[in-house]
Amino acid sequence: MQRHMLKSKIHRAAVTHCELHYEGSCAIDEDLLEASGIIENERIDIWNINNGERFSTYAIKGERGSGMISLNGSAARRAQLGDLVIIAAFAMVDEAELQAGWKPKLVFMDDGNKIKGHRDHVPTQNWT
């Protein structure tokens, strides 16, 4: 059996560009792509923290070191500059890979769209 698992996540990145008339996609700083394990043309889900919008598109490379998160084409209508988003990719993972210790790549952003941390799991949510 295979399970549809979270593979990659870029958490709380700020939208830096919205290019309505660019061919669809989301341009992501190449450093962030590498850190998260997302590759060019991979399907991604984007969740806008500010307005609750959730949509899918595909990743393209943005300028390395720029902090770029550019929503292009119709996706540009789903966010404003500065909105915080979560970018996620999923994978089909078989039971043997899971039992062998398969883990997702999670990247956490600071206020300047620079990486402030990495994790390989989502912590247990507690009531506090």
Swiss-Prot record:
Pfam families: Asp_decarbox. Pathway: Cofactor biosynthesis; (R)-pantothenate biosynthesis; beta-alanine from L-aspartate: step 1/1. Its EC number is 4.1.1.11. Substrate binds at T57, G73, S74, A75. SUPFAM superfamilies: ADC-like (SSF50692). It is found in: Cytoplasm. Is synthesized initially as an inactive proenzyme, which is activated by self-cleavage at a specific serine bond to produce a beta-subunit with a hydroxyl group at its C-terminus and an alpha-subunit with a pyruvoyl group at its N-terminus. The keyword Lyase applies. Its cofactor is pyruvate. InterPro entries: Asp_de-COase-like_dom_sf, Asp_decarbox. It comes from the Bacteria. One of its GO terms (molecular function) is aspartate 1-decarboxylase activity. GO terms for cellular component: cytosol. Keywords: Autocatalytic cleavage, Cytoplasm, Decarboxylase, Lyase, Pantothenate biosynthesis, Pyruvate, Schiff base, Zymogen. It catalyses: L-aspartate + H(+) = beta-alanine + CO2. The modification Pyruvic acid (Ser) is found at S25. It is an enzyme of class 4 (lyase). Its main location: cytoplasm. Catalyzes the pyruvoyl-dependent decarboxylation of aspartate to produce beta-alanine. Heterooctamer of four alpha and four beta subunits. Belongs to the PanD family. This is Aspartate 1-decarboxylase. It comes from Burkholderia lata (strain ATCC 17760 / DSM 23089 / LMG 22485 / NCIMB 9086 / R18194 / 383). The lineage of its organism: Bacteria, Pseudomonadati, Pseudomonadota, Betaproteobacteria, Burkholderiales.
